[in-house]
Amino acid sequence: MTSLAACRYAVVSPVKDEEKYVERTIRSVLGQTIRPVRWIIVDDGSKDRTPEIIKQGVSGIDWIQCLRIDRDGNRELGITEIKAFTVGHKLLEDVEYDFIVKLDCDVELPPTYWEEMLRRFDEKAALGIASGGFFEEH
């Protein structure tokens, strides 16, 4: 077993019009017991307050990088999100990481989420991909 603290992961988050949720996502990533080495947030042309909320939430944090893609308005379900992820992934070329995460910005993670995920990858070398469950509070 390797040290969990030595495990490095990078996160790419395509985001569009998530003003309702993005602040909670930012807080939950900042509160992780094992933080990512880099978090790339790609705003895919939001028309709401998402860019402002992101800017306020991550200002001055050197391991978080944000950028915006302005599109022509045509969105293909799933395809534009993949394109935004690819743009973010290219910005990780200078980053050393063991795992890459695609994280939506409408989720809230418990503080030990990535620590637990990394522990499971460490315990079972055959694991190659992981996903979380969905729980909605009413």
Residue ranges and their predicted role:
Residues G88, E96-E108:
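Short beta-strand-to-loop acidic/aromatic patch adjacent to the donor-nucleotide binding site
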Residues V29, D44-G45, G57, C105:
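Conserved short acidic donor-positioning loop in nucleotide-sugar-dependent glycosyltransferases
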Residues D43-E52, D72, V107:
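A conserved acidic beta->alpha catalytic loop
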Residues R27-P36:
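Short, acidic, metal-binding catalytic loop of nucleotide-sugar glycosyltransferases
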Residues P51-K83, V87-V95:
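Conserved donor nucleotide-binding strand/loop of the catalytic core
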Residues P36-G45, L67-I69:
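Short beta-strand/loop segment that forms part of the nucleotide-sugar
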Residues R8-A10, R38:
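Cell-envelope/extracellular polymer assembly enzymes that use nucleotide-activated donors
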Residues E108-H138:
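Conserved donor NDP-sugar-binding/catalytic core segment of glycosyltransferases
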